[in-house]
UniProtKB/Swiss-Prot annotation:
Name of the gene: tatA
Homology family: Belongs to the TatA/E family.
Cellular component terms (Gene Ontology): TAT protein transport complex
Lineage of origin: Bacteria, Pseudomonadati, Pseudomonadota, Betaproteobacteria, Burkholderiales
Protein name as annotated: Sec-independent protein translocase protein TatA
Gene Ontology terms describing biological process: protein transport by the Tat complex
Residue stretches spanning the membrane: 1-21
UniProt KW Acyltransferase keyword: no
Subcellular location: Cell inner membrane
Quaternary data: The Tat system comprises two distinct complexes: a TatABC complex, containing multiple copies of TatA, TatB and TatC subunits, and a separate TatA complex, containing only TatA subunits. Substrates initially bind to the TatABC complex, which probably triggers association of the separate TatA complex to form the active translocon.
Annotated Pfam families: TatA_B_E (PF02416)
Membrane topology reported for the UniProt record: Single-pass membrane protein
GO molecular function: protein transmembrane transporter activity
Key words, A-Z: Cell inner membrane, Cell membrane, Membrane, Protein transport, Translocation, Transmembrane, Transmembrane helix, Transport
Region (Disordered): 46-77
């Protein structure tokens, strides 16, 4: 009674197929598979970009630094 047998799961599957229909279930499966694939691709891209970012940020920091002499401003009354 604690676990379901294969027959219980088959009955549940048949009921779900009757309620949603096979086309709707297929679309849900495709959407879920596409989301998982997109997530995995995003994780791979994120790891590759994270490794390249420190070197690129140092170059940007060096190229945008402006080196000038500071002038003392006096107050006139």
């Amino acid at each position: 009674m604690g676990s379901f047998s294969i027959w219980h799961w088959l009955i549940v599957l048949v009921i779900v197929m009757l309620v949603f229909g096979t086309k709707k279930l297929r679309n849900i499966g495709q959407d879920l598979g596409g989301a998982v694939k997109g997530f995995k691709d995003g994780m791979k891209d994120g790891e590759g970009k994270a490794a390249a970012d420190p070197a690129q940020s140092k170059e940007l920091r060096d190229s945008t630094t402006i080196d000038v002499e500071a002038k003392e401003k006096t107050r006139q009354q």
